[in-house]
Amino acid sequence: MSKRRVVITGLGVVCPVGNNVGDSWKNIINGVSGIAPIDNIDTEGQVVKFGGAVKNLDISHYLSPKEAKKMDVFIHYGMAAGIQAFEDSGLEVTESNAERIGVAIGAGIGGLTTIEKTADLFREKGAKRISPFFVPSSIINMISGNMSIKYGLKGPNFAIVTACTTGTHNIGDASRIIEYGDADVMIAGGAEMSSTNCGLGGFAAARALSTRNDDPETASRPWDVDRDGFVLGDGAGVVVLEEYEHAKKRGARIYGELSGYGMSSDAYHMTLPSEGGEGAARCMKNSMRNASINADQLDYINAHGTSTPAGDIAETDAAKLALGDHSKKIVMSSTKSMTGHLLGAAGGIEAVFTTLAIRDQIAPPTINIFNQDPNCDLDYAANEAREMKIDHAISNSFGFGGTNGSILISKI
């Protein structure tokens, strides 16, 4: 049976460097950091006092006040990015095609803001004061649910939750649904808003975060010898995936083809990557096999690249293991150096950035590489974007629990 081809026809982003695709991509290419001191919560007593917040998003452009009131902030971000992507695609939903359009937008953690506020309310005033909207405003699948309700989409409606791999797994599994013929169009990605007291405090307690409070803009420094952890970021990234012939028939603008998808498990440790990047390497190999390309055809990797001491070395080793000698010829950069780590939304925004890298034939930079770690010896597009030929690119996501995902996007 021949595989149905899947293409990308819509993009949407809300993130620390911009509230739409155009602004975000311009800032990414220019190496603009979105990391700054946190001002949405009181950081008194917090070890870490900075992050990658979404700035000045006017949610009224996307939701009515009544709708917005019933949703946690992470749903706001997911809806904004989802609506952007839907409008960018030019899709028209009709009675005849509604059952062939679905949604798969997840989050790694979900409605922390609502959960924390409700817990405080319960302690202060008791259970009777809990809002009837508490549960539907905080559970992860409600971005997909609200998107399907807004546009009358009657196809598959779900949300995968796999920590930092959430966005990539939602996009990858959505592509499989189209390949298998269960839908013609899927709106897919991830969202997150974890810059709350518990979110910030929890990751700091796990010693996962950079503590560079005196210089937030340079705190996320993948592959730099002085990296000391990741920077927490918020936002959402969503793509519209579409069966190739369906997209051509309606005259859609096609950004690129989602030609491959790979998954793997480290089966090693709750938070640390497997030794030598073995699990991540298998994941990348699986995506290339699924795309029917050889390692020497790959041009660019949008890395997981979180700026953690162990993770950056493991991903470097994984690229060498997956690509062999060709690893010395590709460019592998981390846009997290500018956005921070958006957890469940990371794979979503990075799928958008990888798609745009192919469209514009330019690799985003990894900023803040001041002194490259000798154990990380690949080409990371240090501090400056790189104009180059990109026919095939991988976007990597690796999450707590040893869950790995890679999508491979190709020029079309």
Please give the residue ranges for each predicted region.
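ACP-dependent fatty acid/polyketide chain-elongation machinery
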Residues: M1-E67, E245-Y255, V352-T366, S410-I412
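Flexible, low-complexity linker/loop segments at domain and module junctions
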Residues: M1-I8, E95-A98, A291-Q297, K328, ...
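Condensing-enzyme catalytic core mediating Claisen C-C bond formation in acyl metabolism
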Residues: R5-T9, A36, D214-A291, Y300
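Conserved beta-ketoacyl condensing-enzyme motif
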Residues: I8, I29-T162, A191-G202, A295-G311
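Active-site-adjacent elements of ketosynthase-type condensing enzymes
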Residues: T43-A53, G110-T114, M193-S220, G262-R282, ...
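Active-site-proximal alpha-helical scaffold in enzymes
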Residues: G78-L91, I140-S144, S148-Y151, P156-E192, ...
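Phosphate/pyrophosphate-binding loops at sites that engage ATP/ADP/AMP, CoA/4′-phosphopantetheine
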Residues: A85-N97, A247-I254, M284-Y300, A322-H326
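Glycine-/small-residue-rich "gating" segment that lines the acyl/pantetheine channel
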Residues: E124-S131, H169-G172, R176, Y180, ...
